[in-house]
Amino acid sequence: QSVEVIQSDRIGAALAAARKFGSVVVLKGHYSVIASPTGQVFINPTGNSGMATAGAGDVLSGMIGGLMAQGLPPFDAAVAGVYLHGKAGDLAANRPELAGAQASLVATDILAHIPFALASLQAGDVSYLEERLLQSVSSL
């Protein structure tokens, strides 16, 4: 399918790919979509345009793989990984020295902010919407 077709129905495209390949699919972008072959869908509320940078996807795949290695099921690991990755990117982009210049983010900025993203989640620093969406994650 073309980029235009996928972007016109991101949820449908992610679900179709998940069902076709029998795998959890992460469709990165503004409000990344995670879909499972059984029809579960999560739309991620975290992240920013500065994260469209070389190496950011490598950081994300490492996070998801690490969560799976700790025993989380693939869908939960993808949801938690994408959420924390986006939260780390948001924290990195909001540093005072960047003065809102998200375009200057590099993958190591995201990597460096993962512990802070995890700490903020563990401290309950989430909005009501994020709390509701995170209920699909069984544990961290």
Spell out what each predicted region is:
Residues G89-L140:
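Charged C-terminal helix
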Residues S2-R10, G71-D76, E97-L105:
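Short, charged, surface-exposed loops that flank catalytic or proteolytic processing sites
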Residues Y31, S49, A56-L60, I64, ...:
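Gly/Ser/Thr-rich beta-alpha loop segments that engage phosphate groups in nucleotides
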Residues Q1-P45, A119-L140:
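Glycine-rich phosphate/dinucleotide-binding loop and adjoining beta-alpha-beta core of small-molecule
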Residues T53-L84:
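Short, small-residue alpha-helix embedded
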Residues R10-R19, P74-A88, A107-P115, L129-L133:
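Short, well-structured alpha-helical segments that form the helix of a local strand-helix-strand
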Residues V41-G55:
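Short pre-catalytic strand/loop immediately N-terminal to key active-site residues, enriched for Gly-Thr
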